[in-house]
Amino acid sequence: MQLEATHQKENHLSPLASFIFPDFRALFNIGFNLYSNINYKEVDINGFEIYIVEQWAAQRKISTLITSYTGNLQDTISAVEVALPEDPEEWPCCLKKYHEELLKFSSPKKTAKGTLFVTNLSSFKSTLNLLHVECGNLKKIWKNFKTNYDLKRLHCGGRSAQLLKKTPSASIAKFAQLYKFPNSAFSHEITSDFQQPSLQNDNSSISSIENIPVNHCPVVELTTLVQISLSYFALFEYKKERDGLLCNGTKQSLEKWWEIYGKRYHGIDKPKNETILGPTTVASLLSLVLTCYFKLMVEDCMSAKDPFDEEEFYSGLYAFQKKYGLSKNNKQTSLDELTIDKLFEVSSKTSNKDIFKFKKVVKSTVQDMTGKGNFMHLSNEILTTDLDTLVKNIHGGSLGKLWKGRSASRKETCMVWERKTFLSFKFERGDPSLQLENNELFYGTSVPSEQLTTSNKEDSDTQPTKRNSIYDIANGSKSSLSISSMFCNYDETRYKSTNNLNRAYRGEYFRRNSIPFCNDGIHDTKKISADLNKIDGLYRCNSYSEVQNAIELWSLPFDSSVIRLARDLLKIQSLMSVQRQLDEIRDGYLGKNSQRSYQNDLMFRQSLNKLQEMCERCKRGSNEFHWEYGNMQNKQQILESEKKDMKSLSSKLKYNVRILDRRVRDVEASVDHFDRKLEDVRKKLLEQNNSKDISMALESPCDKFEFDSFMDSIVQSQQTKYEGLCFKILDKKSLRKLKKEFWKWSTWTFDTFLYKNRPNKEKDTL
């Protein structure tokens, strides 16, 4: 029953269609190649451009690529043609998610080779950085992008516009100086802007994968080792994408690692002046992993040569947790806090005098990893935050290959799956075009499934993916026998006429040369020897076909014979080729007007030389004009700057003049106010005292010397009473004397009353 339901569901599937996806990385990551019934191949599409979205790559979205329509046939992109059902609801689950994400920023556009999802750049978000892939192939520039993007996030690279170019030597030198790499580490660096990786088939064996050369890049390799180290602590969630791209997930994982493990085992916080993956972070993380690795060696739980051999590392870690009863508490084998604390506690009890345990460890392959270093010593001394100290204590493994170029790196011995990325994967399986043709034949002529008999259903139990190869007589090529050819599932009366006509026409048009048809005016008779033309044969008697056209009348409209059309077309082509050969023999390859053509050709070359000379003069004049134009622009910029300075100075001058005018007005107002007050005081004095001396003093000249002498005479006169006292007080000398006398009296008062007992106290202290 379940098998019948499956076949009914397959019979109700929508017809297949061709879909074009230029994002190789997205297709490989979602694992569409795991479905054996999907056929695909690589194709080239003209008139489109592709762009990498920098922020999407950092966020590790499914799609990091957008496609834009240009209409220019010189713009070519490489993509994957996939044969899928027309209804996306019938796609596999992974392709459904990819399709939903594509519809968020693009819309389907039908092309000659299939449906392509195109993005309108005018309505695209301007906050996202678009990197134009000039070569049109994501495979060729992805390694450059990954290296340059990591250098940019490490503050060793430049602008985003250069992420797809060759890595600058200045960025490499800065990275090598910052992370203590020797110059020999970059001997296998990318040497071209676009490098085509070696391709491999999806069915290749492990041995063939191991022989593929790996492009060693220290920047990407260092990031990959950091991501593997974070996965040991169960902090890196992208386990299938440890590809060396310094993404936002790596940044968040490093921050979590510092909060949980960095503060606890190193006693410091993450340096605020460092980047995402600074030297302190690299040394702290890798040294903690190496410390745990050496301590597992001391406990005789680790047999791997390389701490970054993940399978062996997890096996040793699981053995340690099982040995001390920690595996029951952990659902996932990882370096959690409980495991690390137990590892530090147990390994501290181990002594170098334990010769028996030392012999057990020496029997393993520790010397290949440690080299000159002692693993027991390194298990307690390699934990550091200084990168120089870490590099000095590295003697082999992946870290030794990375920093010192010695020993075998990971993946050359065990972890082969990392090399099988979309860069080395060959996107080719089956023939989507042939599958689409068979599908069109099936769905274009199929009858409803209710009309099928039980016997037909039993005969069609064969899987559609298992096809038998037959030979197509019509076109002379191999094809696949699908469900549609197993039983008659179409209306013969409707399909048979057109199918027979097409087959007859193609058979006649592409028919090979044969002896009975040599003199029919269609084929070249010169290629056939004279002996073959003289063929003996039986005398043909008269047939009805010779008089058929005269006896039987054709009624219009009528369908002419497709065989006659094919023969007439071939005859016309043969006559045209013969006429062309005769014309060439008679008139030459240039035709009748060969002499005139030669003269025209000569005149054309002379004119072309003159035009080239004029073009060179125009170029020189254009260069001079551009040079003068640049000088004029520089002078204009200088004048503009001086003009701006003049404007600023004039505005400052106007401002200062306004301030000065305001202050002058304030001074004038203050003087007027003082004059009014002075006049009021004079009037009050005259009103209160009608003395003539006061009026004379007030009306005296403005000379200071005369005024002072007159005031002294008034004060010293005997007739002054209250008025003299007032002027005496107003006199500066009197005020000065009064001040001195008041100070003397106050000093005497304080000395007499307040400090009366001071000498006695001083005596007591002595």
From Swiss-Prot:
Report the superkingdom from the record: Eukaryota
Signal peptide residues on this chain, from the entry's feature table: none
Q: Which cysteines are joined by disulfide bonds?
A: none
* Residues found modified as Phosphoserine: 514
Key word Phosphoprotein present: yes
Any one cellular component term from GO for this entry? Answer: Sin3-type complex
Keyword annotations of the record: Phosphoprotein
Residues of the region (Disordered) are 447-469
Described function: Binds to SIN3.
Q: Which family does it belong to?
A: To yeast STB2.
Tell me what else is known: Present with 211 molecules/cell in log phase SD medium.
- Return the PANTHER family for the record: PROTEIN STB2-RELATED
**Name of the molecule in the record:** Protein STB6
What species was this sequence derived from?
Saccharomyces cerevisiae (strain ATCC 204508 / S288c)
